[in-house]
Each structure stands twice: as structure tokens, then as C-alpha cells.
């Protein structure tokens, strides 16, 4: 358990169009319980780790960026209850003497509801841009020649305004990324080259309403390590 207190930042108060000089400090009572299990040297796994956390937050005057018709604005939600569960899994599997598979994944369930005004139409509705379900997964095959990676990020439906009605709904999405990488020795330093295909399936989605994210794209990066 912990009790927290957060003052509005300078940008929260004064940023052009977004800021709100009337913001009140945010206060919260936070409760959390979690377990972690890990093991090395198993017959299948070199290493495996599992975590599970549950939490409940009772928040007064929660500071949020609130979407309006033409611009975003910082505002206080008078009373918010947030409950959630976070789960993660990480594992390393040796495939051969020189090749291994590294896997990881995470899932979040979060219910964050507005309890400010019991007479309001959005009473007990999920906060804007807060998905109930979200998760990620990744896998990398490491070899002496090249590393092959895959990752996916998924987000469930959200609402871009306070009322949880179909007109305000933003569809969920699942984005995939593939990568190839290899590290070279160059004298006293090392060069890591990586090629990626981002949004492999060319998924059309919005993170923010009316601002579509890019489709399929390619990226090549190089990193020197001295």
C-alpha cells in the first residue's frame, strides 16, 4: 500500500492550448499485491520467469489529458477507481548448442472508471483512451549468423470521449513486426546492423482518433558499441 500525491507539471498548467491553470493536485491510495516465480536449468528451459500483479487505485482529482472537439485539454477527474492485473512471461529455450529461442509476453487487464458524478451519463464508464485489454509478445531466434525476431502488440477497443457508446468507440488493433540483426566485430568496437519490417500486415488503425498510424514500413539501423 502507498499513498501518493502528484502536483501538476509546468506543461500541465501552462502549455499552449493544452494547459489548464485551474488543475488541482492528484491524490491516490494505491494497493498492490504480486508474485514472481523464476527457475533456471530446467530440462526444456535455460530460464523461465512468470510474474502476476494485481492492483487497485482510489484516485481523487486524477490529472488527465482530456480530448475535446478541436484540441486536447488537461483536466481533473474528481473520482476514479482503477483496478487491474498485469501478467508477464519470459523464457529462454536452447534449440542446439549454438542456437536458442528467447520468448517474452505480457498481458494487462485494466478497468478505470469515472465516479465523479453519479448523475452524469458517463458515470462508471471507462476513461477515454484506456483499453480494457492489451498485450504484447515477442520471440527471437539467436544464431551465430543472424538473429531473427518477431513481435506483436495488441490493444483492445477504447473510447475517445467520456461516454462509452458505439459512436465514441475506437477499434482495437494488432501490429506485427519482423526483424533481422547481426553484430560484427570492427577492430576495437562492434557494429550492430538491424533490418525491420514494421506493421507487417499493413494494419490500418488509430491510436488517437482521426490520426491514422503508418502502414507497412521498413527500417534499417546501425549501432556502434565502443
Give the role of each language-model region.
Residues 1-32, 47-50, 54-77, 153-163, ...:
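Surface-exposed extracellular loop regions of Gram-negative outer-membrane beta-barrel proteins
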Residues 3, 25, 37-39, 79, ...:
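Residue-level signature of outer-membrane beta-barrel architecture
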Residues 27-31, 79-85, 129-135, 172-176, ...:
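Residues that define the transmembrane beta-barrel architecture of outer-membrane proteins
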Residues 32-36, 88, 214-226:
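Outer-membrane beta-barrel "beta-signal"
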Residues 41, 53, 163-170, 177-181:
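Short, glycine/charged-rich beta-strand-loop motifs at protein surfaces that mediate ligand recognition
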Residues 43-58, 75-161, 192, 201:
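Gram-negative outer-membrane beta-barrel transporters
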Residues 138-140, 147, 177-183, 192-196, ...:
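One-face residue pattern on beta-strands with alternating periodicity enriched for small/polar residues
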Amino acid at each position: 500500500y502507498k499513498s501518493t500525491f502528484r502536483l501538476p507539471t509546468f506543461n500541465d498548467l501552462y502549455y499552449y492550448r493544452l494547459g489548464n491553470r485551474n488543475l488541482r493536485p492528484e491524490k491516490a491510495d494505491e494497493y498492490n499485491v504480486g508474485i514472481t516465480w523464476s527457475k533456471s536449468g530446467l530440462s526444456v528451459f535455460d530460464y523461465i520467469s512468470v510474474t502476476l500483479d494485481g492492483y487497485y487505485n482510489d484516485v481523487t482529482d486524477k490529472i488527465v489529458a482530456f480530448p475535446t472537439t478541436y484540441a486536447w485539454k488537461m483536466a481533473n477527474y474528481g473520482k476514479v477507481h482503477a483496478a487491474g492485473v498485469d501478467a508477464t512471461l519470459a523464457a529462454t529455450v536452447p534449440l542446439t548448442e549454438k542456437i536458442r529461442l528467447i520468448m517474452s509476453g505480457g498481458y494487462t487487464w485494466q478497468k478505470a472508471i469515472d465516479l465523479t458524478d453519479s448523475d452524469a451519463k458517463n458515470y462508471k464508464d471507462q476513461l477515454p483512451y484506456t483499453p480494457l485489454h492489451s498485450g504484447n509478445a515477442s520471440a527471437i531466434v539467436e544464431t551465430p549468423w543472424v538473429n531473427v525476431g518477431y513481435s506483436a502488440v495488441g490493444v483492445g477497443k477504447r473510447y475517445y470521449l467520456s461516454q462509452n457508446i458505439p459512436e465514441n468507440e475506437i477499434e482495437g488493433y494488432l501490429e506485427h513486426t519482423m526483424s533481422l540483426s547481426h553484430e560484427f566485430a570492427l577492430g576495437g568496437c562492434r557494429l550492430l546492423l538491424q533490418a525491420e519490417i514494421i506493421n507487417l500486415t499493413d494494419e490500418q488503425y488509430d491510436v488517437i482518433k482521426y490520426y491514422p498510424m503508418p502502414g507497412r514500413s521498413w527500417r534499417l539501423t546501425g549501432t556502434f558499441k565502443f
